[in-house]
């Protein structure tokens, strides 16, 4: 099954600046309520988020002034400042809008260096093999071109990818974006530019709140669970249309350039292909896609 990037679900759409979605006061200590909304469904207890994909896919923002203007124009309440650690896990801070704007005019937001050197389970016992023996601070510097909305939140919230810098103004050499940048510079020195198009494979699983229980295969639209292998099965892929449509809608809102979808060999295992593009841009998109899916 191939679904174009512009695929639409049945979700109700509106727009944050002019909609009746409850807004929070920027900078207030109270955190905004969060809710994950499923395409085509509306909770009686809480209104489903309304967003306009054309209105909320931000233009290319090249500098800090344009970023500040966009944050205020679209009534962004909080900014999620994100960095990938060495395993690609999302690390960072959630900052009220005006505090984030203040940080743009200073050295940026500080995090401990070990934040980037954790295992997938959060262990960092061996970080001194990579970083300094002292758990020193590093600085998160937002890349304005990466700012996107978080379309599944009730309050207007932005997400932005940050680079990591030392107090001496040098890039943190083991930060993933810095590593990739050095690789790209090596290619550029030889007159080459990588063009990449990764594919991401993942499993859909039944909701599980008990860590002692194994993950299960979810029930599809037919009311049944997959029991065998269905590589490239069309009907097998269609079993999960509701969540697939939602993924494509959220990717469009976040300007994540995905294309073809296929069912892989495992039960409820899907594969989504990214469109060809610049290596850094695609790496950023894959990083954001992992939280979308």
Regions found by a protein language model. Give the residues of each.
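ATP/Mg2+-dependent ligation/transfer catalytic cores
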Residues: 48-260, 282-288
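Short, conserved phosphate-binding/catalytic loop or strand-edge motifs used
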Residues: 200, 264-272
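Extreme N-terminal basic, low-complexity initiation segments
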Residues: 2-12
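Short, Lys/Arg-enriched N-terminal segments with co-localized hydrophobic residues
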Residues: 36-47
